[in-house]
């Protein structure tokens, strides 16, 4: 078993133990700093959840386990919000390596499909976007939702999405404080 496979198995076990609704299926290694990130699925909803720890260069197993354990309630809150509000949506939470964007680079919009369901987005300005993105750099996350009809849009950001912002901010704050960054 390679070192990458050993790390993947060890950290996957810790994450899945902490968050039973998360299953991990991929591992990424940053060749420059030797740190890892893991990607998997949130069960019961369409979407993906990535606990990306590259930004913090976490290599100590005990520290990693402490962070996962201490932030369990925050991630559960995020899961509850997504499950309640976005069960019919396709949601992806990722950390794209190539994208480091400040909040002021984004525009806000709500897209409605023919049934009246809301597809909430915060997206970078694309010329012809059928897939629009919500991205916040709180623990490096992005949420993308496919808009069924992007001709219908509103400039208002609903309160429930602000709840998700708050969870990201809290998770970022907790990890930052834990690592004394």
Question: What is each stretch, according to the model?
Answer:
Residues 44-70, 76, 106-166:
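Intrinsically disordered, low-complexity regulatory segments enriched in Ser/Thr/Pro
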Residues 25-43:
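Short edge beta-strands and adjacent turn/loop segments
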Residues 34-38, 99, 141:
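Short beta-strand micro-motifs in enzyme catalytic cores
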Residues 1-26, 60-126, 152:
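Negatively charged, low-complexity tracts enriched in Asp/Glu with abundant Ser/Thr
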Residues 3, 32, 155:
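Residue-level signal for functionally critical sites in structured catalytic/ligand-binding pockets
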Residues 2-3, 176-181:
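Short acidic DE-rich linear segments
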Residues 167-171, 176-177:
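Flexible loop/turn and low-complexity linker elements, especially glycine-anchored beta turns
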